[in-house]
Design a protein with these regions (language model features):
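Charge-rich, well-structured scaffold segments of protease-associated domains
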Residues: 1-76, 111, 119, 141-271
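Phosphate-proximal small/polar/acidic motifs at interfaces that engage nucleotide phosphates
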Residues: 136-137
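His/Glu-based metal-binding/catalytic segments typifying zinc-dependent metallopeptidases
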Residues: 75-133
């Protein structure tokens, strides 16, 4: 529910990204709707084929020839979506019988090819991107408000959405949100120590290596690179960023992108 409220608030209601799936959408769906959608979307010029493994040339030719038989279309699959630019909003949807409350903090950020993307990923990982993150230590271990909390920067078309999300115990939503902002403030005012930075770099290096440690993982990673116009050189750039990242850079990024007044908050459940 919190995610739906976020999307409705970022995108215009009635657009594909801003319209949550409702029961009546499914009830009103017909075979004709599905056929029309299939004809509009499943077009030869919209298909990228990725294959990995011991594949012969004749197999590749057969696959390509098969999909080339589909028709072609220049009609956009998803129309251009307008973004709501208001920041720092508060949305509350009560659920009186809920035993937990969902908190969601979010803001719109840059696209995948932005120059700060790799360094911001390191900042995000430190804040809430792995089990030893600041948010896990604060909101879970120290405060005991939740079993799990995480942050992510999700890339969509020409922008991204940074968010922090967690299900917290009843009546502790406000305290949990304040704890999140306390950790963001620490990132903006205190440089990360050498030991914590070393642990963070080790974790990220391992995560990047796991993303290409077998043929299936490598293909998934390559598909993502291809989607955003990148290639195998991206892996080298990721490791170069890990090597050169400094406490000063992390502090600067936190101040540049995570100012409290720009972050919207959602609570679903009880305060």
């Amino acid at each position: 529910i919190a995610s739906q409220l976020m999307l409705k608030n970022i995108y215009q209601l009635g657009t594909p990204l801003g319209t949550p799936l409702e029961r009546e959408h499914i009830e009103n769906l017909s075979i004709d709707n599905l056929k029309e959608y299939h004809q509009q979307v499943f077009q030869a010029n919209r298909i990228n084929i990725f294959a990995a493994g011991n594949i012969e040339d004749d197999e590749t030719h057969t696959i390509v020839q098969t999909f080339q038989q589909l028709s072609k279309s220049s009609t956009p699959i998803i129309p251009t979506t307008s973004l709501q630019t208001q920041e720092g909003q508060f949305i509350y949807e009560p659920r009186e019988n809920s035993l937990q409350s969902t908190i969601l903090l979010y803001k719109k950020l840059f696209d995948y090819n932005h120059t700060d993307r790799r360094e911001f990923n390191i900042l995000n990982t430190l804040l809430g991107g792995y089990f030893g993150s600041r948010l896990m230590q604060k909101v879970r271990e120290e405060c005991g408000y939740t079993y799990s909390i995480y942050s992510e920067n999700s890339y969509i078309c020409d922008h991204s959405i940074f968010f922090i999300e967690s299900d917290v115990i009843e009546g502790k939503a406000d305290e949990s949100i304040e704890a999140c902002f306390e950790e963001i403030k620490r990132l903006q005012t205190e440089e990360i120590g050498d030991e914590e930075l070393s642990t963070l770099k080790t974790y990220l290096s391992g995560a990047y290596l796991r993303s290409v440690d077998c043929i299936t993982s490598y293909m998934k990673t390559y598909v993502r690179w291809h989607k955003f116009g990148l290639n195998e050189e991206e892996m080298g750039q990721l490791f170069a960023t890990i090597k050169k990242i400094s406490p000063q850079t992390i502090l600067s990024l936190a101040n540049r992108y995570l100012q409290r007044e720009t972050i919207s908050t959602i609570i679903v459940g009880k305060h």
